[in-house]
Swiss-Prot record:
This is Dolichyl-diphosphooligosaccharide--protein glycosyltransferase 48 kDa subunit. Belongs to the DDOST 48 kDa subunit family. Glycans are attached at N286. Pathway: Protein modification; protein glycosylation. Subunit of the oligosaccharyl transferase (OST) complex that catalyzes the initial transfer of a defined glycan (Glc(3)Man(9)GlcNAc(2) in eukaryotes) from the lipid carrier dolichol-pyrophosphate to an asparagine residue within an Asn-X-Ser/Thr consensus motif in nascent polypeptide chains, the first step in protein N-glycosylation. N-glycosylation occurs cotranslationally and the complex associates with the Sec61 complex at the channel-forming translocon complex that mediates protein translocation across the endoplasmic reticulum (ER). All subunits are required for a maximal enzyme activity. Residues 1-22 form the signal peptide.
Length: 426
């Protein structure tokens, strides 16, 4: 009996846990490698993922793998550590459909990039530099080495602590550069300094890419909240990189990669809305109508709870920030911003517009590093009933006076006309 109760408890707990993770990134991950020896040189990276519960399936780039079957995707995440392979079993169009399905992609490059990887990057708004080029910096490089292509990089993304969570340790980077397009969906996670430039690795001839426009690590968060991250260095994820040092101090490479990958695979920065409350607190009309029926110019209270997923704690916690609320019927009649409290509740009182129709109450959050939140609720707003208007409207007093003066004048004229007799001439 005891074993039965333990089994039932385990099943219920598993169901609850799966329901939580159903709202965030899944764990089925395909890892495509140029060479299976990368499993050894990058063992710490893969081990950290497995410790988090990710189910990794390793395949060589020339192995036939199907991402989608009968409309269902076989994986939730895709790791492409095959920058030079021209023999991928799936095309850039397949990867694009994978992203359109809401799945996540992490891929890395080297100083030689295959056309498949270039096409995938181009679809995601990233233009990779020519083959056999590297990013150089004659001022910000590892002084323990004579190689000026080993950068000491600390130009992290601003205004988005959710991606790197305030990481301030510099990292070592050696790889190819890229440029991101002017697109609000693209994030420059790590860029070169103002003295960095891209050049041929052998001849040293520089290209047009230079300064802070040199992308080292960039991401795309699609409109369906799928996340794609590209690193110009495959070595960034290696064991050697994780334990590298800068001026005899530990570098931030390992911490940088862990935070970057956890964000890419949707362990953080995922928002959800719940507990909507839209109630009437006062009315402009004189009649007593049902409380769930809204009429024009009613005073209403709007309340919405917003939470974000904490991958470390494995649960939803309140999101404290700002939220944009719009009341729309073709055009927005009301647009305002609401600050959340410590419990993640966003509340506001406002008066409905003096226009009737079916209105959309749209709450949205569009913030770098967080998933896009669009909560939509539709509600009809009715005009006043015939018995809801005031008996006399002050603005119409001049018209009332005109009507009554006309009536009185007509009455007086009628009396005079009826009872006044003209004197006959004799």
């Amino acid at each position: 009996m005891m074993m039965k109760s333990i089994l039932i408890t385990f099943i219920i707990a598993s169901a609850l846990l799966s329901s939580v993770f159903a709202d965030i990134g899944g764990k089925r991950t395909l890892v495509v490698l140029d060479d299976l020896s990368i499993k050894k040189t990058h063992s710490t990276f893969f081990k950290n993922l497995e410790n988090k519960g990710y189910k990794l399936q390793f395949e060589q780039s020339n192995t036939k793998v199907v991402l989608e079957k009968y409309g269902d995707f076989n994986f939730d995440n895709l790791i492409l550590f095959s920058p030079t392979s021209e023999s991928l079993s799936f095309s850039s169009a397949d990867v694009t459909r994978f992203i359109d399905g809401g799945n996540n992609v992490l891929f890395a490059g080297s100083n030689v990039i295959s056309e498949n990887i270039r096409d995938i990057a181009a679809e995601c708004g990233m233009e990779i530099e020519e083959d056999k080029t590297l990013i150089f910096d004659h001022f910000n490089y590892d002084k323990s080495q004579s190689d000026h292509s080993v950068l000491v990089a600390d130009q992290f993304i601003d205004d988005s602590p959710i991606i790197l969570q305030g990481l301030n340790k510099p990292i070592l980077f050696k790889g190819i550069g890229h440029k991101i397009r002017n697109n609000p969906l693209n994030y420059a996670i790590l860029t070169g300094s103002s003295t960095a430039f891209s050049a041929k690795a052998i001849s040293g001839v520089s290209t047009k890419l230079m300064g802070k426009s040199c992308g080292l690590v960039s991401s795309l968060q699609a409109r369906n909240n799928a996340r794609v991250t590209f690193s110009g260095s495959l070595d960034l994820f290696s064991d050697k990189s994780f334990y590298s040092k800068i001026d005899n101090k530990e570098s931030g490479n390992k911490e940088f990669v862990e935070r970057l990958v956890s964000w890419t695979f949707q362990e953080r920065g995922i928002l959800r809305a719940s507990e909507l409350e839209l109630v009437k607190i006062s009315t402009e009309s004189n009649s007593t109508v049902a409380p769930d029926v809204f009429t024009i110019k009613d005073e209403v209270k709007y309340s919405l709870k917003v939470e974000e997923f904490d991958g470390i704690k494995g649960k939803w916690v309140p999101y404290v920030g700002s939220l944009q609320l719009e009341v729309i019927m073709l055009d927005p009649y009301i647009r305002t911003f609401i600050k959340g409290d410590a419990n993640g509740l966003y509340k506001i009182h406002f008066k409905l517009p003096d226009v009737y129709g079916v209105f959309t109450f749209e709450a949205s959050i569009h913030k770098s590093g967080y998933s896009t939140l669009d909560h939509i609720y539709r509600k009809p707003i009715l005009p006043f009933r015939h018995d809801s208007y005031e008996r006399f409207i002050p603005a119409a007093f001049p018209y009332y006076a005109t009507c009554f003066s006309m009536l009185i004048g007509t009455f007086i004229f009628s009396i005079i006309f009826l009872f006044n007799k003209d004197q006959l001439n004799k």
